[in-house]
């Protein structure tokens, strides 16, 4: 069951009810709290574009608690984060794994954060293929291409050498907030406001 809390706000015209995500959006906060698929990506991209249209100079904050998901959906979010004018701050709450970790690192350098008990996990892309041998070969080439592309972007975002990224993403690589800070995936650990 997916319950979305409602908040009541007092205005000069009386009370107004918002779902919590709409209320957070007014404060330029976007929640990424699920696996990343095309629907989630479309929602996040739409919110980023909307907030840019409201004020292109003011930061946007994305809170991430995600197990990861689709590479193409995640890249749609990543490209939009880089494309829009406002700086995008990222904050890991809980777990940022796989594409969630990639998006955490994609925040504006100096504005990538994690809470003290959060975890970050990086690994190589996952995929599978079936069908004729030529189709399997095409799928394998694509996933190897994506692996190199994602590793290169992460190397640029973290300051780690590409060879280190290739080694460290070979298997699931879980990190505490402290380790993610040392690695360059985040810039600061938040303990309070």
From Swiss-Prot:
Protein localization: Cytoplasm
Enzyme class, broadest EC rank: hydrolase
Entry's EC annotation: 3.4.21.92
Catalytic activity from the UniProt record: Hydrolysis of proteins to small peptides in the presence of ATP and magnesium. alpha-casein is the usual test substrate. In the absence of ATP, only oligopeptides shorter than five residues are hydrolyzed (such as succinyl-Leu-Tyr-|-NHMec, and Leu-Tyr-Leu-|-Tyr-Trp, in which cleavage of the -Tyr-|-Leu- and -Tyr-|-Trp bonds also occurs)
SUPFAM superfamilies for this protein: ClpP/crotonase
Keywords (A to Z) from UniProt: Cytoplasm, Hydrolase, Protease, Serine protease
Xref: InterPro entries: ClpP, ClpP/crotonase-like_dom_sf, ClpP/TepA, ClpP_His_AS, ClpP_Ser_AS
Active site: 98, 123
PROSITE patterns in the record: CLP_PROTEASE_HIS, CLP_PROTEASE_SER
Signal sequence interval, chain numbering: none
GO BP: protein quality control for misfolded or incompletely synthesized proteins
Gene Ontology molecular functions: ATP-dependent peptidase activity; ATPase binding; serine-type endopeptidase activity
GO cellular component labels: cytoplasm; endopeptidase Clp complex
Family per record: Belongs to the peptidase S14 family.
Role this protein plays: Cleaves peptides in various proteins in a process that requires ATP hydrolysis. Has a chymotrypsin-like activity. Plays a major role in the degradation of misfolded proteins.
NCBIfam families: clpP (TIGR00493), PRK00277.1 (NF001368), PRK12553.1 (NF009205)
Subunit structure: Fourteen ClpP subunits assemble into 2 heptameric rings which stack back to back to give a disk-like structure with a central cavity, resembling the structure of eukaryotic proteasomes.
Protein name: ATP-dependent Clp protease proteolytic subunit 2
Organism expressing this protein natively: Bacillus cereus (strain ATCC 14579 / DSM 31 / CCUG 7414 / JCM 2152 / NBRC 15305 / NCIMB 9373 / NCTC 2599 / NRRL B-3711)
Gene this chain is encoded by: clpP2
């Amino acid at each position: 069951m997916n319950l979305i809390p409602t908040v009541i706000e007092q205005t000069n015209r009386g009370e107004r009810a918002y779902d919590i995500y709409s209320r957070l959006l007014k404060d330029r906060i976007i929640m990424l709290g699920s696996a990343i698929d095309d629907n989630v990506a479309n929602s996040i991209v739409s919110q980023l574009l909307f907030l840019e249209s409201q004020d292109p100079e003011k930061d946007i904050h994305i809170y991430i608690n995600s197990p990861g998901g689709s590479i193409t959906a995640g890249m749609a979010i990543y490209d939009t984060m880089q494309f829009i004018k406002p700086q995008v701050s990222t904050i890991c709450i809980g777990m940022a794994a796989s594409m969630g970790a990639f998006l955490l690192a994609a925040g504006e350098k100096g504005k990538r954060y994690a809470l003290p008990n959060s975890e970050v996990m990086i690994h190589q892309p996952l995929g599978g293929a079936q069908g004729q041998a030529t189709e399997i070969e095409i799928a394998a080439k694509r996933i190897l291409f994506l692996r190199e592309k994602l590793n290169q972007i992460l190397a640029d975002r973290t300051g780690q050498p590409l060879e280190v990224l290739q080694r460290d993403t070979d298997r699931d690589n879980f990190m505490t907030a402290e380790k993610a800070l040392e690695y360059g995936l985040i810039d600061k650990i938040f303990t309070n406001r």
